[in-house]
Amino acid sequence: MDYDFTSAARHFAAKNAFTTGPHELAGMIGAKADIVIVDVRYPADFRASRIPGAINLPKGKWEKPAGLSKEKLNVLYCYNPQCHLASEAASALLALGYPVAEMEGGFSTWEAFGSPVETPAATAVAA
């Protein structure tokens, strides 16, 4: 077998530096890390349910992003493991100078882990 260990090591080191998972993100939220959570799904899906504290930045809003920070890590997520919206948004936002990471697995994985979800009813009760 011809395997390039050096390239593989670089690939996984880079991947680990710029991605997170639901468990890690929940830990960041619990520790009140100085991050911005960015949901890049369609607005209707965002309104229905989202990661608590997330802002919505759907495709079409990436060129002039509102609510992001160039001083904080912006953690992006989309629908599911097959969705590429978060990585597309990451590329666009990086080009504008925003530090980003992607939560792998998307919102469906967040829910599958039993992580907290914010919904209109939950938001209304919390207010």
Language-model regions: role of each:
Residues 55, 73, 117-121:
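Short, hinge-like loop/turn segments at secondary-structure boundaries
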Residues 1-36, 43-45, 119-127:
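Flexible, polar/low-complexity N-terminal or interdomain linker segments that lie immediately upstream
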Residues 42-56:
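Acidic/glycine-enriched edge-of-secondary-structure segments
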Residues 29, 50, 114:
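Short, flexible helix/strand-to-coil boundary loops that buttress conserved ligand/catalytic motifs
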Residues 63, 68-111:
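Catalytic cysteine-centered active loop of the rhodanese-like fold, especially the PTP/DSP P-loop
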Residues 39, 54, 93:
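Terminal peptide-recognition signature
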Residues 55-63:
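Glycine-rich, highly charged phosphate/nucleotide-binding loops
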Residues 32-37, 52-53, 73, 99:
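Short active-site oxyanion
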